[in-house]
Structures are given as structure tokens and as C-alpha cells.
């Protein structure tokens, strides 16, 4: 389904290394999958100190793995569960794995560095992985198609977008119990918080909008149309702007958070899918589904 590698670029956009996703799971104490297994990388998140990257794999391929995942899967349909990889950023090699659910997608590291959180698309769940041991400590059922995750600055709560519905789950990271922000809009996919944790922003893939939610009350306080199928987004370090990729509009929208006004729209190429703000140079990196990367300078 995906090309089996992780590519690492330096800040100048030069390719530093291509990391194959082939692993010998037995070397990490995993049984039932002898020989070499391959993954299918989807998303990555970094530890606070930048020493490690954690990478989800849409599916695994090799001995002991069954049907590969698909976006049309259902919980309990037999889709094989997958693994989270840990990449050592000094050696640029995979040095740890953790078993998670079926078709893991988004990855987030809690600011206190205790957990790595993984949304399991086909298991309808959130995997909570202990970062120190690289072991799943709990799998929290959520409902169809969990996707984006963001964690509060104090690591007390995680917000999870449930793309198969209209809601956002709120996970208490101390008790690992679930609450809800209901009816934010159709197909919530990606989430970001402002630096204070006061406002939550969600892309609505189905509605073509971004919504702003007051986290204290769980109330939607604003919304803006950004384009067709807004997928991923990021927020500027000062919290004043959002950067949203619109998959079917083939562009990036810059949104002012104070009043949710679209201040700029930039063409990107066909099907922009991922985006991140690089704060040391004030640049926005955009991943295109066809395999290209577009780097924009923020003004």
C-alpha cells in the first residue's frame, strides 16, 4: 500500500537518510513473527529532547500477519494488528517496537514524556504506550475511526478526533477514562491546541471547515470554511495562526485564530495531506500525497 521506508531530511531540505522499515521483531522479544517483517509508515512524533521518533505503521507484512488494513475496515473484522516503531535519531535506526491496534494512524507524545498515544483506526481505539518500556498499558475503546490526537500542555488530558462521527473524545491521562465533546461537526480529523490549552481547533473533513472549541466548556465558539476536505493542520508557536491543508482544493489555508479569518491561500499541488510548522526558520513543510514535499516561508 505504501512505500516501505522513512525519509529523514535536514533543515535545509537535504535528504539525510532513508530508513527501511524492515525489522526482525524477534530481536525485540516479539513472538509469532519469525524472520523479517515490513511496515507501512504513516505518522511520526518526537520525544521532547528530540532523541527519538515514534512511527506508526498502517499495516505489517511478513510471517504471522494476516489481512492488511484498509480505510474501510471494521473493528473485529480480522485486520491484523500492527506495531509502533521507535527510531533513534542519533543512529537513524529502529531501536524499539510496541504492539498496538489495527491500522494505527496518528501518534502523539505527552509533554511529560510518560506516554506515546496512538489512534488505532480499525480497532476503534486509542493505544496508550508507556514510553520507557515501549509496552501498551491500556487500549481505550472510542468508536469508529479515531484519527488526530493532541495533548494538553500539563499532560492531564488527550483529545482524540473521531473521524467516523461528529465528536472528540477527551481522555483523562491520570485515570485513563473517557469523556466527550459532542457534535463539533462532520468528520473531525486533525486537532491542535493553542499554547495555553484554552482553545482546541479541529479540521472537519466532511464539512470543509475548521472549528474552534473552548476546552473549559466544551463549546464550539467559532468555525470557518477553509476548502474541500481539510485534513491536517498546525499552529504557529505563538498561537496566532493555523495552517490547514485542503486535500481536494490542493492548497494550504492560513487562518488567523483571533477571528478565524482566512488570510492567505497558497496552491500546493495535488492532494496535500500533511503539514508541520518548523519554528527555527518560520517555515511550513507540506507533504503531498504523490510523494513531493513543498516548503513555504511564513510571512
What are these regions (language model features)?
Residues 1-299:
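Predominantly soluble domains enriched in secretory-pathway, periplasmic, or organellar proteins
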